[in-house]
Amino acid sequence: MRKKTAFIFGLGYVGLHLAHQLNLIGWDIVGTSRNPKKISPPGNCTWKILPFDVDSFTNEIEAHLLDSQIIISTIAPIKCNDPVLKQYRNILKQFSGWIGYISATSVYPSQPNRWVDETTVPKPATARGIARWKAEQEWDEVTGAEIFRVA
């Protein structure tokens, strides 16, 4: 039986929590970090942690992407460009598994004293929000990713 592998771009705060929860239900974890030596998987988890350089494609990451069943990206855009799509667009475009993109609520307009939910039309007012909104649209167009907006 083939192992279930989840590939997570960006093992930061959200990525680490996702990795831990997926690992608890039987998924093998491969993830990236700009500084892999700072990541310590909890308990006896044996995660594969790869270095991620926003300006470099690596064959090792490509090989693990091709061996994964799900891919999640938590990496924020840099200068209005998504670094994951910049390097791995062609692989992600052809990926047949499930893809998720973790975005942010900064894509919504300021709504003092009002609820914001998935029916609220995105209208970012900050540079970070605009970059996230652009990245969401690109992930959807290229991969059909499910978009999650976290606060």
Where in the sequence are the language-model features?
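Conserved N-terminal Rossmann-fold NAD(P)-binding element of oxidoreductases
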Residues: T5-L11
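Conserved Rossmann-fold NAD(P)-dependent oxidoreductase catalytic core, especially the SDR/UDP-sugar
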Residues: R89-A127
